[in-house]
From Swiss-Prot:
GO terms for molecular function: ATP binding; protein serine kinase activity; protein serine/threonine kinase activity. ATP binds at I126, A127, K128, G129, A130, T131, S132, T133, I134, K153. The keyword Coiled coil does not apply. Has a role late in meiosis. It is found in: Mitochondrion. The lineage of its organism: Eukaryota, Fungi, Dikarya, Ascomycota, Taphrinomycotina. One of its GO terms (cellular component) is mitochondrion. SMART domains: S_TKc. One of its GO terms (biological process) is meiotic cell cycle. Its EC number is 2.7.11.1. Keywords: ATP-binding, Kinase, Meiosis, Mitochondrion, Nucleotide-binding, Serine/threonine-protein kinase, Transferase, Transit peptide. This is Serine/threonine-protein kinase ppk24, mitochondrial. Residues 120-416 form the Protein kinase domain.
Length: 461
């Protein structure tokens, strides 16, 4: 049986509208176009060259479609100012020693919860992505003297191009503007941003986000090593649906849903992370003013069909397709298609069967599901998974985005409601301060040391 192999997917960011603009105007890629009036000193942390015109007063105002930062929009835009009203930040580090470092108040205004790398001790690097490196760090509680473990996502500066350095800043600001505002047990908690320099002139200067430490790695590894039982997979399915349904309720398009971006917490709960490509597309509860997104953003095998052939599309509906691919990989270990374009043999066959049986209306039809599983090798493993899971996956994999079911409706189905799920979690830690949150990885994880759950997804040591 022929199947598309399962492998790690890199994130791509191809903005079709930006490409079109750049072809018309070679100077269209600028800090001012992306951020509005942003102080040039802020970008010195990433060694980004800024032209003098960037910091001049202008009528350019940050818009939600430009960068998703609600805490900035509320503070600056509501008072009829553009980002930023502070025209010259001049971040200066003061004090006689490294332990007396202080930030310029104006930079603190942008990142009010910012801390310093000297608050943390670096232990080791555990992962490396396109724009960042994940490092395990510790913080010693000043009162109890206990070590607390965290994961620091360090955004690397690149020496290659202005565009890549600018993209790194975009990822950082997007993650910090979105992720800390989310309150859900299946969303990775960000503790604070952190400056990674002792001098503003330090060439290694930059920023990082201090997050929960998930010592068991990502979901990709568990799928790859084939250690998950059917019970585990069903539990994970429900947790994934809960996490993405929560994002949809908050009108946030993640745009890069994949196993690599789902971590396994110390208590065995899934933690969705990596919001560097995410966008806020509307206000919670408002179905009338949802803003469309553009470009092929995410990972190729998980991208919805509309990302390849439409200039603008609904990011929330595209996430539902990605969720379907993710669940298919979770249960079978194979991609259904290399990409959801007509040049892909199996996707083309999928579309042909759908047209013949349903007229491209619903992938819920039993006749369609029977035929695609029979005729498409990459979908044949679906015959061996629970009927409920199969129906969910195929219903989400509808080329017509308007006919993809909402995740709330899926969570409300009888089959999903009956699933045993690790949902008896506590969220008490989510509102505590940095000193109070304790993710201690100093001790080996054993089944006896864990808080009782319905399932134990931990790897035995």
């Amino acid at each position: 049986m022929t199947n598309y192999p399962f492998f790690r997917q890199g994130t791509i960011f191809v903005d079709n509208s930006a490409i079109q603009r750049n072809s018309e105007n070679k100077n269209s890629l600028s800090i001012e176009n992306i951020f509005g009036r942003f102080p040039k000193e802020f970008f010195q942390f990433f060694s980004i060259n800024v032209s003098k015109s960037t910091t001049k007063k202008s009528s350019v105002v940050i818009k939600p479609s430009t960068i998703t930062a609600p805490w900035l929009e509320n503070e600056y835009l509501d008072s009829n100012t553009s980002l930023l009203s502070v025209h010259s930040i001049q971040p200066s580090f003061i004090g006689m020693s490294d332990f007396a470092i202080g930030l310029d108040p104006s930079l603190k205004r942008i990142l009010p919860e910012i801390r310093f790398r000297l608050d943390f001790q670096h232990l080791k690097s555990i992962a490396k992505g396109a724009t960042s490196t994940i490092k395990v760090v510790t913080h010693r509680d000043k009162i109890t003297d206990a070590k607390i473990y965290y994961a620091a996502k360090v955004y690397r500066k690149t020496k290659t191009s202005h565009k890549k350095r600018l993209n790194t800043m975009v990822y950082f600001l997007r993650e910090w503007s979105i992720q800390p505002k989310l309150d859900h047990p299946n969303i990775l908690k960000v503790i604070c941003p952190c400056v990674t320099l002792t001098s503003v002139f330090n060439k290694s200067a930059g920023f990082c986000l201090v997050q929960e430490y998930c010592p068991q790695g990502d979901l990709f590894k568990q799928i790859e090593e084939k250690v998950l039982t059917l019970e585990d997979k069903c539990c994970y399915l429900k947790q994934i649906l809960q996490a993405v349904a929560y994002l949809q309720s908050q009108r946030i398009a993640h745009r890069d849903l994949k196993p690599e971006n789902i971590l396994i917490g110390r208590d065995g709960l899934l933690k969705l992370t990596d919001f560097g490509t995410s966008e806020i597309v509307g206000n919670p509860g408002d179905n009338e003013s949802i803003r469309f997104v553009s470009g092929a953003v995410g990972s190729l095998a998980y991208l919805a069909p509309e990302a390849f052939h439409e200039n603008e599309y609904c990011g929330l509906l595209a996430d539902r397709w990605s969720c379907g691919i993710l669940l298919k990989v979770l249960f079978t270990g194979y991609f259904p298609f290399k990409t959801s374009v007509k040049t892909d043999l199996y996707y083309s066959k999928y579309m042909s069967i759908l047209t013949d049986t349903c007229g491209i209306s619903s992938t819920d039809e039993s006749s369609f599901q029977t035929e695609v599983i029979k005729q498409i090798p990459t979908l044949q493993p679906l015959r061996y998974i629970p009927e409920g899971a199969k129906k969910i996956i195929l219903s989400l994999l509808n080329p017509d985005s308007q006919n993809r079911p909402s995740l709330d409706s899926i969570l409300g189905t009888a089959w999903v409601r009956k699933l045993d799920c690790c949902s008896n979690f506590s969220t008490d830690h989510e509102n505590k301060s940095l000193q109070e949150v304790d993710f201690d990885a100093s001790k080996p994880i054993t089944r006896k040391s864990l808080i009782p759950r319905i399932h134990n997804h931990q790897t035995l040591v």
